[in-house]
Amino acid sequence: MAFLKKSLFLVLFLGLVSLSMGEREKREEEEEEEEENKEEEANEEGKGESEEKRGLVGTLLGHIGKAILGG
């Protein structure tokens, strides 16, 4: 019986951790989208295409870095 309790607590704990991580990733994605929207608005005002390209490359490198580091 004690083994079942420990297993249940472990499963619940891991589930809470994964939910917490998912919420954090969701917030980060929303923040990135807001930043991208601000950059797009700034680009529409005439800042040029070079900043848009740099922003795209930076975003891609950020996602690749997160995937490699697992963060």
Swiss-Prot record:
Please provide the Gene Ontology terms (biological process) for this protein: defense response to bacterium; innate immune response; regulation of defense response to virus
- Taking the first listed entry, what is the main subcellular location of this protein, grouped into a coarse class? secreted
> Any keyword DNA-binding?
yes
Q: Where is this region: Disordered?
A: 21-56
Query: Key word Signal present in the record?
Result: yes
Glycine amide PTM positions:
70
Pfam families, alphabetically? FSAP_sig_propep
Tissue expr = Expressed by the skin glands.
Q: Where is the composition biased (Acidic residues)?
A: 28-43
Q: Which GO terms describe its molecular function?
A: DNA binding
Propeptide regions on this chain: 23-54
**Keyword terms of this UniProt record:** Amidation, Amphibian defense peptide, Antibiotic, Antimicrobial, Antiviral protein, Cleavage on pair of basic residues, DNA-binding, Immunity, Innate immunity, Pharmaceutical, Secreted, Signal
Q: Which residues form the signal peptide?
A: 1-22
Membrane spanning residue stretches? none
Family from the record: Belongs to the frog skin active peptide (FSAP) family. Frenatin subfamily.
What name does this protein carry?
Frenatin 2.3S
Q: What species was this sequence derived from?
A: Sphaenorhynchus lacteus (Orinoco lime treefrog)
